[in-house]
Amino acid sequence: MTTIASEAYIDDSVNFESFKLDARLLQAIKGSGFTHPTLIQSHAIPLALEEKRDIIAKAATGSGKTLAYLIPVIQTILDYKKSRTNGDEPGTLGIIMVPTRELTQQVTAVLEKLIHYCSKDIKVLNLAADLSTSVLNTLLSENPEIIVGTPSKILNILERNTDTVGIDDLKFLVIDEVDLVLTFGYQDDLDKIAEYLPLKKNLQTFLMSATLSDDIQSLKQKYCRSPAIIKFNDDEINKDKTKLVQYYVRVGEFDKFLFCYVIFKLGLIKGKTLVFVNNIDRGYRLKLVLEQFGIKSCILNNELPANSRQHIVDQFNKNVYHLLIATDDADNIKEFDDEQKDDIQVEEKNDETNTVVAEESTNSTTGIKSKTKNNYKQDKEYGVSRGVDFKNVACVVNFDLPTTAKAYVHRVGRTARAGKSGTAISFVVPLKEFGKHKPSMLPSAKKDEKILSRIIKQQSKLGLEIQPYSFDLKQVEGFRYRMEDGFRAVTQVAVREARIKELKEELLASEKLKRHFEENPIELKSLRHDKELHPARVQNHLKRIPEYLLPENARTDKKKISFIPFHKPNKVGKKSKNSKNKKRKGGKTDALKKF
């Protein structure tokens, strides 16, 4: 979020001084490296500050939506505090709602940078952490001007702390990533929150999103009054996306692990890599397999404590880690259901006689929906493929293909940001290869070819192309027996033990992050998340690649290798041995000389 936007989004005709911002805010903006606003900012900020309009904005990821609402919120709060004649401190003036804890941390981090020079006038409460009731009441009693959290967290404090939270002076309500908020099942929470807020009175509302679905219309009617709707034609902006090169590889289930081993061990990808898997077990299995070959990686999933997750993202952005395996099991559930229904409708049109098959498909869809939602409620505030600001990612590897075409867009959107180039590689399991290797099988891979066709169709509409990528199988085959050795050592029991061990370590680390490292921030750098778990039998010989397996251009030049004797010569040792023999043959020795 704080990264500099791509040139395709910058509006060179305007500068931030033209918005007549507070000098302290202006200094913080320049200190963050921003010289010109983006297109969304140059349109939204004047409408919000001068005309006091509600804003509904649709703009692509990385276009600067966060600053488009934070700058007006901060500026108006500063103006409001200056205009107050009485000395009473106002209550909460702004509420910002985001879909996940990760985004809560990110928005708070950007907010704290912007209020760096006016922190005495504006206090921020971050609801990402699980705070005890007493601590939360203490923080709320200080009347923070801005509260940031997920809808469920905001609703919780409104219901339980009605007397503590002063919302009589509330001026702003922001819902960031609206489409994702609705998809994550927060509609009921939003309806209840609306009962507590002075909507359509003095409340200015911002609804920000990368896409505008029909569901947003209900929020528009409930939360907004004569809003200004800002949309951008993505045709010009999508020219920047040509810097994203996309490939797909048709591979068997076991060959996914083989290709990952070859790619990372031979260093075929330069720079930081983000690998997406579809469930937690897959992430740990891949990590343990790579550990067999001495390849370090760290895990990011919804089981880890929120503090640890944020620390992992921060360290990845600071180049501490170069390989991050992220679990993206919270795919867009609603989109998944819609696509399943589309499949059923197509099948019914093509073959009207197969009504039984269609009914079975409907039943299975319902089963998937209910099963997924049950798991999904547990992970409601976790999201990694959407909105999280991974910086300078050179490559995204879809180790497991996502279950929807939209989820694919969000994943590959983590690279090729801010005008930089990037690569996306997706592994696709052909239907004929599905189920041939049971230990590495993933049920969702059965639909990989269908999902791929949707992805190709969607990308072609955007003027983008996904190219097939073919490995030199002769060179890859040489590594197969080593991968079979390494994969065999990573059993289901080893994966389970790895999950337990990692969770225990991260829980301890989370407490350290929470308490100890607040007092010792320097020691925070020493806390790492890519340590080897070692619950599986590690074979050290697999960490080294024999010369004959390497491509010719990667082998050592034989002409530069000098002669290396089998035994290390020890001239001193030989002399001492000979001298002993001579002494034995020579007979008597002079006692004085010996002394």
UniProtKB/Swiss-Prot annotation:
Chain location of the short sequence motif Q motif per the record: 14-42
Segments forming domain Helicase ATP-binding: 46-230
EC number(s) stated in the UniProt entry for this protein: 3.6.4.13
One GO BP annotation of this record: maturation of LSU-rRNA from tricistronic rRNA transcript (SSU-rRNA, 5.8S rRNA, LSU-rRNA)
Annotated compartments: Nucleus, Nucleolus
InterPro entries attached to this UniProt entry: DEAD/DEAH_box_helicase_dom (IPR011545), DEAD_box_RNA_helicase (IPR050079), Helicase_ATP-bd (IPR014001), Helicase_C-like (IPR001650), P-loop_NTPase (IPR027417), RNA_helicase_DEAD_Q_motif (IPR014014)
Similarity remark: Belongs to the DEAD box helicase family. DDX56/DBP9 subfamily.
Name listed for the protein in its UniProt record: ATP-dependent RNA helicase DBP9
Origin species: Candida glabrata (strain ATCC 2001 / BCRC 20586 / JCM 3761 / NBRC 0622 / NRRL Y-65 / CBS 138) (Yeast)
Organismal lineage: Eukaryota, Fungi, Dikarya, Ascomycota, Saccharomycotina
